[in-house]
Swiss-Prot record:
Protein name: Chaperonin GroEL 1
Species: Burkholderia pseudomallei (strain 1106a)
Encoding gene, per UniProt annotation: groEL1
Reactions catalysed according to its record: ATP + H2O + a folded polypeptide = ADP + phosphate + an unfolded polypeptide
Residues covered by region (Disordered): 526-546
Record text on subunit structure and interactions: Forms a cylinder of 14 subunits composed of two heptameric rings stacked back-to-back. Interacts with the co-chaperonin GroES.
GO biological process: protein refolding
Annotated Gly residues bias: 534-546
Enzyme class, broadest EC rank: isomerase
Keyword flag Coiled coil: no
């Protein structure tokens, strides 16, 4: 085991604070509409230029072990805020730096760090409650577009695209971001349920121009096993043929004689059918088949439920207005399922989302909700160069997270104003002793810091602006983009409540841990072994002069 360096008290804290400051100073220059860019070196290819706080934070790794500990703790603030709320990483970093910096002064003067932390926690809890009171719901397209634009570093075109996508697929719909093929941003919307399985044979195609099979008003047969024997399918095929409607078969697989017969019937025009594999694997496949059954108003024909293919009736088949089957995707539009059943299924999946432990499971469950409740929208990001594409794509993803957060918990005035207004709830707070009161003061001071940094990045005098905003009421604040004092909500400068709340809570949590640290243990740097000596010199010539 390598030897460790153990550092105590002020020496440990001082080094860690240096690390906090290095990271925070690099991140905070990106804050606000007039924030600056940071250039990140890449080991291959060109450098990345970004204004995204969390991207900058993730790149920072310091040589000094103790400094690096401090930096990594603040990096955790940025990452956690980004994961929970999708934005607010720079605000969280600025808040954490301020709480640590102010708190260290009190710790150095001999105050009890534990009481300081209690005071900080008390103030943050009061501020969060006040933020909830200030918050107003985010419902209109205009408000959603404003949130998206602010989060994408004041790019209104991104905000508009996200608002349009949400309008088309609903608040629960899946919105994904992909690289575009042109210079302009594009929005593709898939209405209905889409899953990533295509036709099992190209002979099913009936629209050669688009290379898809289109079924109008079809029945949908759902089966959880392989189908290889045509005898199993015959009874249900005869019933569908009598009804004179097309049929989509979704099964674990359709092969051999069964597939060949379906293809022949299709080519001869006897019965229009398409066969596709069921989406997903294992338990997820069963769940997705059940989702499709509920969406189309049918049943999954499975032995577990006592149903068999030979005895299947039309009543057990699902129905839809239209189904499109491509090479890789199947889209079910306007399924005949009961709205009540679909809502109940969505509610059930939501409960599973809350109980899910892994991010992957949560993401897959969220996709299922979206497919049942809304639809799927794809924002294709356009840019001139790959460097610009990466940077823009990251901003679109941030903005998307922020708009989801706004729809979830509402919005507050942006530009650091909400935190200034929330200070009113803390101003009258008192702790049990002087040390707790000092903790409350630390948070009071820290809540000015985001506004100060926005103003500083805009090249103005921070103290004057903070005093002017604090003297105002409600949504009155400073719009750094124009340099004017305005009603922030009317001007479209808004933040999701969840983002501001999460930033404050995470910053206080990590800053509190740093203040109450009294020892740090780090690995000693390995000393490089000296280079081995060179080879001894060659021996003299052996020749003898005659």
């Amino acid at each position: 085991m390598a030897a460790k360096d153990v550092v105590f008290g002020d020496s440990a804290r001082a080094k860690m604070v240096e690390g906090v400051n290095i990271l925070a100073n690099a991140v905070k220059v990106t804050l606000g509409p007039k924030g600056r860019n940071v250039v990140l070196e890449r080991s291959f290819g060109g450098p990345t230029v970004t204004k995204d706080g969390v991207s900058v934070a993730k790149e920072i790794e310091l040589k000094d072990k103790l400094q690096n500990m401090g930096a990594q703790m603040v990096k955790e603030v940025a990452s956690k805020t980004s994961d929970n709320a999708g934005d607010g990483t720079t605000t969280a970093t600025v808040l954490a730096q301020s709480i640590v910096r102010e708190g260290m002064k009190y710790v150095a003067s001999g105050m009890n760090p534990m009481d300081l932390k209690r005071g900080i926690d008390k103030a943050v809890a009061a501020a969060v409650e006040e933020l909830k009171k200030i918050s107003k719901p985010c419902t209109t397209n205009k408000e959603i577009a404003q949130v998206g634009a602010i989060s994408a570093n004041s790019d209104s075109s991104i905000g508009d695209r996200i608002a349009e996508a949400m309008d088309k697929v609903g608040k629960e719909g899946v919105i994904t971001v992909e690289d575009g093929k042109s210079l302009a941003d594009e929005l593709d919307v898939v209405e209905g349920m889409q899953f990533d399985r295509g036709y099992l044979s190209p002979y099913f195609i009936n629209n050669p121009d688009k290379q898809v099979a289109v079924l109008e008003n079809p029945f949908v047969l759902l089966h959880d096993k392989k189908v290889s024997n045509i005898r199993d399918l015959l009874p249900v095929l005869e019933q569908v043929a009598k009804a004179g409607r097309p049929l989509l078969i979704i099964a674990e697989d359709v092969e051999g004689e069964a597939l060949a017969t379906l293809v022949v019937n299709n080519i001869r025009g006897i019965l229009k059918t398409v066969a596709v594999k069921a989406p997903g694997f294992g338990d997820r496949r069963k769940a997705m088949l059940e989702d499709i059954a509920i969406l189309t108003g049918g049943q999954v024909i499975a032995e577990e439920t006592g149903l068999t293919l030979e005895k299947a009736t039309l009543a057990e088949l699902g129905q839809a207005k239209r189904i499109e089957v491509g090479k890789e995707n199947t889209t079910i539009i306007d399924g005949a399922g009961e709205a009540v059943n679909i809502e109940a299924r969505v509610k059930q999946i939501r409960t599973q989302i809350e109980e899910a432990t892994s991010d992957y499971d949560r993401e897959k469950l969220q996709e299922r909700v979206a497919k049942l409740a809304g639809g799927v929208a794809v924002i294709k990001v356009g840019a001139a160069t790959e460097v610009e594409m990466k940077e823009k794509k990251a901003r679109v993803e941030d903005a998307l997270h922020a708009t989801r957060a706004a729809v979830e918990e509402g919005i507050v005035p942006g530009g650091g104003v909400a935190l200034i207004r929330a200070r009113t709830a803390i101003a009258s707070l008192t702790g049990v002793n002087a040390d707790q009161n000092a903790g409350i003061k630390i948070v009071l001071r820290a809540m000015e810091e985001p506004l100060r940094q926005i103003v500083t990045n805009g090249g103005e005098e921070a103290s004057v602006v903070v005093a002017a905003v604090a003297a105002g009421k409600g949504n009155y604040g400073y719009n750094a983009a124009t340099g004017e004092y305005v009603d922030m909500v009317e001007a479209g400068v808004v933040d999701p409540t969840k983002v501001t709340r999460t930033a404050l809570q995470n910053a206080a949590s990590v800053a509190g841990l740093l203040l109450t640290t009294d020892a740090a243990v780090a690995e000693l740097p390995k000393e490089d072994a000296p280079m081995p000596g060179g080879m001894p010199g060659g021996m003299g010539g052996m020749g003898m002069d005659m």
